[in-house]
Amino acid sequence: MRYDGTVIRPPSEADSYILQVTYGCSHNECTFCGTYLDKPFRVRPEVEVLQDIELAQEVLRGTRRVFLADGNALVLGTRRLTAILDALHCAFPDLQRVGAYANARDLLGKSQSELELLRDKGLRIVYVGLESGSDEVLRRIHKGATAAEMIESVRHAQAAGIRVSVIALLGLGGPELSAEHAQATGRAVSAMDPRYLSLLTLMLVPGTPLYRQWRNGSFELLRPEAMLAELREIVVHLEGLTGCVFRTNHASNYVPLAGTLPKDKSRLLAALDDALARGRSALRPEAWRGL
């Protein structure tokens, strides 16, 4: 298998075969993200993708999961995606699911029948970076979508039978917009009612616009305790979920939590209250945090 540049995947895809079908991110303007700063977006030639699948077939027999990289593989047209999915199922008879990152524009750009076709071909989960439910925060970070568009895109995918894992980012509004960010994020996720919700904590990446804003004083990073308080506020505003698997086990977070909402909401809030009462001693040390 051949890879170009930095390749990332969600923690839940740790055991998946990672197949690059695009390079970089077609948007690549989010001010906090440094993943693809050195990798201009381009579509990988289809013949190369199919060759990689043939190579993987020889060494990854028994593969059950595949993740399509890079930043938003669903930018590809439906015909090309179905050809890739067909080739994967031919190469890996035991394949159970294929996953990919997707943004609102990608999902809304495909019809219901197109998404249903992709689901039938094996695309069973997409990972969507909501980041924030606040339109002001989304505008400042140059996300390229409004909260309403993000909500619509997740509902659109789920209506086609594709599971969605939503990702939001603690601290993204700084102290100024912390309350708005937390409350609006909780409301947006509630409106989405996704199968999975993961919260990460902002870590500034050198070379990104947000890092430069922090250096020049125009953006302020939340203190760890304030990050935790923001997390609690998001959980408080999560209402009407129907079996959402909730995780804060990413290495960027100060406190790892896991549960299913709404069943475990009271337990999660109690754990957060305990951590807030204990202060720094309850938090993951900075040296242990990472992206």
For the regions a protein language model found, what residue spans apply to each?
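Hydrophobic faces of well-ordered beta-strands that scaffold small-molecule active sites
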Residues: 17-19, 64-66, 96-102, 126-128, ...
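Canonical Radical SAM [4Fe-4S] cluster-binding loop centered on the CxxxCxxC motif
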Residues: 5-48
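Aromatic/hydrophobic pocket-lining residues that form the small-molecule binding cavity
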Residues: 49, 81, 111, 150, ...
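Conserved strand-turn element in the central/C-terminal portion of the radical SAM core barrel
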Residues: 105, 133-137, 157-181, 200-206, ...
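Catalytic cores of alpha/beta
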Residues: 113-115, 173-191
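Auxiliary Fe-S-binding modules of radical SAM enzymes
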Residues: 1-13, 92, 187-291
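Conserved, mostly hydrophobic/aromatic
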Residues: 25, 33, 49, 68, ...
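Conserved SAM/AdoMet-binding glycine-rich loop
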Residues: 57-159
